[in-house]
From Swiss-Prot:
Name assigned to this protein: Large ribosomal subunit protein uL6
Subunit structure comment from the entry: Part of the 50S ribosomal subunit.
One BP annotation, GO: cytoplasmic translation
Gene: rplF
Keyword terms: Ribonucleoprotein, Ribosomal protein, RNA-binding, rRNA-binding
Domain of life (superkingdom): Bacteria
Secreted recorded as keyword: no
Organism: Dinoroseobacter shibae (strain DSM 16493 / NCIMB 14021 / DFL 12)
Record GO terms (molecular function): rRNA binding; structural constituent of ribosome
Family recorded in the similarity comment: Belongs to the universal ribosomal protein uL6 family.
Classification via InterPro entries: Ribosomal_uL6-like, Ribosomal_uL6-like_a/b-dom_sf, Ribosomal_uL6_a/b-dom, Ribosomal_uL6_bac-type, Ribosomal_uL6_CS
């Protein structure tokens, strides 16, 4: 059984947290983010340390304890450092570029793919074959990266498509005569 909930979340300098009911609000140099925990846990802020305690001994309370601790830890990381996902594009003629708030992708389809970037996330293209997604919400950054990758997942024969930076694609051998 994981005991991640027992670990308190320490607040770095320049970050403040306040609890009102089941909602915790964390303010940092990059943003202000909040999280509402379930009634199975209690949240406390004392001496720049956030502690999460389960309200009972039930299985659900223990599950929410670990999950809430991880979510609060991600809030603190997001408002201090932020989160970043990098995508690589491989394939002849495959390219990406930002135009305003729209990511334009040429992926070998008969049309250009236009992806509207949601608020709270910044997308940049340092090269035409690289996409960098940054933001303070880990879930939103990962979801945007997954949505972009879904347009052309890497195929196993030539490796063409959009992949996460450093992702290993299992390559298959073609048909033999």
């Amino acid at each position: 059984m994981s005991r991640i909930g027992k670990k308190p979340v320490e607040l770095p300098t320049g970050v403040t947290a306040s609890v009102s009911g089941q909602t915790i609000e964390v303010k940092g140099p990059k943003a202000t983010r909040s999280f509402t925990a379930t009634d199975d846990v209690t949240l406390k802020v004392e001496d720049n340390v956030i502690t999460i305690e389960p309200r009972g001994k039930s299985k659900r309370a223990r599950q929410q304890w670990g999950m809430s601790r991880t979510m609060v830890g991600n809030l603190v990381t997001g408002v201090t450092n932020g989160f970043k996902k990098e995508l690589e594009i491989q394939g002849v003629g495959y390219r990406a570029q930002m135009q305003g708030n729209t990511l334009k992708l040429n992926l070998g389809l008969s049309h250009e793919v236009n992806y509207e970037v949601p608020a709270g996330v910044t997308v940049t293209c340092p090269k035409v074959t690289e996409i960098v997604i940054e933001g303070t919400d880990e879930q939103l950054v990962g979801q945007v990266a997954a949505n972009i990758r879904d347009w052309r997942k890497p195929e196993p024969y030539k490796g063409k498509g959009i992949r996460y930076k450093g992702e290993f694609i299992f390559r298959k051998e073609g048909k033999k005569k």
